[in-house]
Regions:
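Conserved nucleotide-sugar donor-binding catalytic segment
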Residues: 113-172
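A recurrent flexible, glycine/aromatic-enriched loop bordering the glycosyltransferase active site
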Residues: 45, 53, 95, 101-131
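Short aromatic/hydrophobic "clamp" motif used to bind/position activated sugar donors
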Residues: 60
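Acidic donor-binding segment of Leloir-type glycosyltransferases
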Residues: 2-37
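Conserved donor NDP-sugar-binding/catalytic core segment of glycosyltransferases
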Residues: 68, 72-102, 131, 172
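Hydrophobic/aromatic residue at the end of a short beta strand that borders the catalytic acidic motif
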Residues: 44, 63, 68-73, 94, ...
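Glycine-rich, basic loop-to-helix element that forms the pyrophosphate-binding segment
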Residues: 38-55
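Conserved short acidic donor-positioning loop in nucleotide-sugar-dependent glycosyltransferases
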Residues: 10-14, 42, 65
Length: 172
């Protein structure tokens, strides 16, 4: 529902031919898909940071390989950014492998620092202004496995305006 987006992929030396072929096909079909094929797997933080360096937008959102966004997710996030948010998160749920059944909704509270310090209720989808992401240094190597929580803590500590969109816009 929004044409102003790009998807940046960093392939961390995947040995799967079908993955490489799919990524190459995406870039040929639509120039909003950008791919770099890395010579090595740099871990979750390193691979994500490599993808972040490819992004040209003023706002960036982090997604995993198995994520599905609602059709209006990008538009909703951009509207929050236009309203002054520099850190945005949404509600989420899980989706069946065939993409037909949605279950286990995670309806999150508005920003609650003490709750975030206790555990990562924010998870995905997380989006931030490029300026804020750059200010906190992106994801930190050495935090793979808890990288999303570490990033959410640092983004929230440095954000000017945090916005929770109380809609399920992210499925995994």
């Amino acid at each position: 529902s929004c044409g102003a987006w790009e998807a940046c992929f960093y392939d961390g030396a995947s040995t799967r031919v079908d993955t490489r072929e799919l990524l190459q096909a995406l870039t040929q079909e639509d120039n909003r898909f950008r791919v770099t094929f890395g010579a090595e797997n740099c871990g979750i933080a390193g691979n994500t940071n490599a993808a972040l360096t490819m992004a040209t937008g003023e706002f960036v959102a982090l997604c995993d390989h198995d994520d599905l966004l609602a059709p209006d997710a990008v538009r909703c996030i951009l509207e929050a950014a236009q309203d002054g948010a520099d850190f945005v998160y949404t509600d989420e749920d899980k989706v069946s492998a065939d993409g037909t059944h949605f279950f286990e909704p995670h309806l999150k509270p508005d920003f609650a620092p003490d709750s975030l310090r206790s555990g990562n209720y924010i998870c995905h989808i997380t989006a931030a202004s490029r300026a804020l992401m750059n200010a906190v240094g992106g994801l930190r190597p050495g935090f793979d496995g808890s990288q999303a929580h570490d990033l959410a803590l640092r983004l929230s500590e440095n954000a000017t305006k945090i916005t929770h969109i109380p809609r399920i816009l992210y499925h995994w």
